[in-house]
Regions:
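Conserved functional hotspot residues or short segments at active or partner-binding sites
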Residues: 1-22, 388
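Preference for extracellular/luminal or secreted protein segments
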Residues: 17-93, 314-315, 324, 343-499
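Second-shell residues forming the walls of enzyme active-site clefts
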Residues: 60, 83-84, 109-128, 132, ...
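Generic enzyme active-site microenvironment
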Residues: 70, 135-136, 236, 333-334, ...
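A short aromatic-anchored loop/beta-hairpin motif
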Residues: 93-104, 291-292
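Substrate-binding cleft of extracellular glycoside hydrolase catalytic domains
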Residues: 123, 132-171
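Flexible hinge/switch segments at interdomain interfaces of large molecular machines
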Residues: 149, 191-199, 240-246, 284, ...
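A substrate-binding/cap region within the structured catalytic cores of diverse enzymes
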Residues: 159-186, 193-214, 221, 225, ...
Length: 499
């Protein structure tokens, strides 16, 4: 090999290397240009969509909006709605509702309840429709919907078991509720109440609360939610940010809680922090004013005046506090929108639009739906929400986020894969109100019994209500109460102690 050949080979090698470098640089420039285009136009390199993302992308705007509604058929044509009829079946088939709420008027007996929920899901899933979140307020105690179910004591009784038993009985109660609802096809429970009972004049919470200790309330609520989740029943913490420290019932008026965020974090919000850490999937809002957290006012179409925004309609509270600061990724559902706390001051369309803007994902009972004529009002609400999306009042991203949250919970709880063959009447009859559940009910009630030791004149300062003491009439225990100054009235032993 001559020297000239070596030089020539070197030149050729340099040319080849230069060509390779040029090719690499061309490719790099192309990649950079494509990446810049992605950033400019908001697109990203293709990533496979999740199942839920694909479903949301393929849904019409109307179907997205109706998926954000939880409706009730509490009665139909002035009669309790307990058996599916052709009118309601057609409504469910046509509207693609996300959820239906049931009341005691709807679920009286096991076989009847089973047949009703199965018929609802059959109508909802016809022709490829999405299965429903079917809910009830099965709190236990005074708020109790399932007529044939196990009649568990209320939350305050569970609170009474906490000192000696920790969260044991709250978990067992959650399991009983979850097993009985779930086997009937009721896959959502609008419970537990996680309000802290820190106002003795509260007319609506009281015994529905676990108690006045925020830490205890959070732990018991988390245990109850975990028990329900074992049976794929969605638990709901309510009423955010807190309905405990009020003297007004939001069913009949608009309460106010005037507290700083620091104070709320120590009391009202503490149980929600625990519930969110435990993976709670649904939180219900409160129709309550929180002026230190939301000071904005909006002119109401109903009153013609500027009205303060309750938590249900507050962006600062629902999006800023609950979703962003507290990290909640589940479904925000309203309390019933026909309650006076909302309905007295806002028309139905405006209240729903503002609530969705604020961060609500699921609207509970936007209007009554008790006869065929009520559909006109429902259509007005749906059309009003659609119009608000189309004119930009409600961003499409907000709607997509809401529907994504709803479908994600449905996917996680197996509702998207609903199969009627997973349910049988025989299974339901074997579980609802079964002997094992009744035995746990009695054990829980016994564990909740609390003794009070009276020291001079203490009893005389208390007003006490004993419920279910019919077995104590004419017994030594009752004589002891009377001897302590109690005045006993009635077979149910409602006792009123003289002050």
């Amino acid at each position: 090999i001559t020297g000239s050949n070596l030089v020539a080979d070197g030149i050729n090698n340099d040319r080849g290397m230069n060509e390779m470098i040029d090719s690499f640089l061309d490719g790099l420039n192309t990649f950079k240009a494509e990446r810049e285009a992605c950033l400019i136009y908001g697109s990203e390199p293709e990533v496979p969509m999740t199942r839920v993302e694909q479903m949301v992308a393929e849904m019409s705007l109307r179907d997205k909006v109706t998926q954000m509604l939880m409706v009730d058929f509490r009665d139909w044509n002035s009669k309790d709605f307990t058996v599916m009829n052709d009118e309601v079946r057609q409504i469910i088939e046509d509207y693609n509702f996300g959820s239906i709420i049931l009341f005691a008027d709807n679920i009286k007996e096991t076989e009847q309840s089973y047949n009703l929920t199965m018929a609802m899901q059959e109508a909802a899933t016809k022709d490829g429709g999405l299965a429903l979140i079917i809910c009830a307020d099965q709190e236990g105690g005074s708020v109790y919907r399932l007529g044939s179910g196990t009649a568990l004591p209320g939350n305050m009784a569970l609170g009474a078991t906490y000192a000696n038993n920790g969260t044991k009985y709250a978990y067992e109660a959650g399991k009983i509720i979850g097993s009985e609802l779930g086997i009937l096809g009721i896959n959502g429970n609008l419970a537990p109440v996680v309000d802290v009972n820190n106002n003795a004049n509260n007319p609506v919470i009281g015994l529905r609360s676990y108690g006045d200790d925020a830490t205890m309330v959070g732990e018991l609520a988390a245990a109850s939610i975990a028990g329900m989740a074992e049976y794929n029943v969605i638990g709901t913490a309510k009423h955010f940010p807190g309905h405990g420290d009020t003297a007004t019932d939001s069913h009949y008026g608009l309460p106010m809680v005037d507290k700083s965020l620091d104070v709320l974090m120590e009391t009202e919000l503490a149980p929600y922090t625990v519930a969110i850490e435990q993976g709670i999937e649904m939180i219900m809002t409160a129709h309550i004013l929180y002026p230190q957290q939301e000071s904005d006012k909006i002119v109401s179409n109903k009153t013609g005046k500027e009205e303060s925004l309750p938590a249900t309609m507050s962006d600062d509270i629902l999006t800023g506090l609950l979703k962003e600061d507290m990290g909640f990724e589940g479904i925000i559902v309203t309390d019933a929108m026909n309650m006076a706390g909302i309905a007295d001051k806002w028309d139905q369309v405006q209240s729903c639009v503002i609530a969705i803007q604020a961060g609500v994902d699921l609207i509970c009972m936007p209007c009554r739906l008790y006869c065929q004529a009520d559909l006109a009002n429902l259509d007005k609400i749906i059309d009003g929400i659609i119009a608000a999306v189309e004119d930009g009042t409600i961003p499409m991203e907000r709607v997509n986020d809401a529907v994504t949250r709803i479908l994600t919970v449905k996917e996680n709880r197996g509702i998207l894969d609903y199969n009627a063959e997973d349910y049988t009447l025989e299974k339901a009859q074997a579980v609802v109100g079964c002997d094992a559940n009744r035995e746990m009910e009695r054990e829980l009630a016994a564990a909740a019994v609390t003794g009070f030791i009276a020291k001079e004149n203490v009893v005389g300062t208390l007003a006490v209500c004993f419920v279910g003491l019919e077995n104590l009439i004419d017994t030594e225990e009752l004589a002891m109460l009377e001897g302590a100054g109690a005045e006993v009235a009635g077979v149910l032993a409602i006792t009123k102690v003289a002050a």
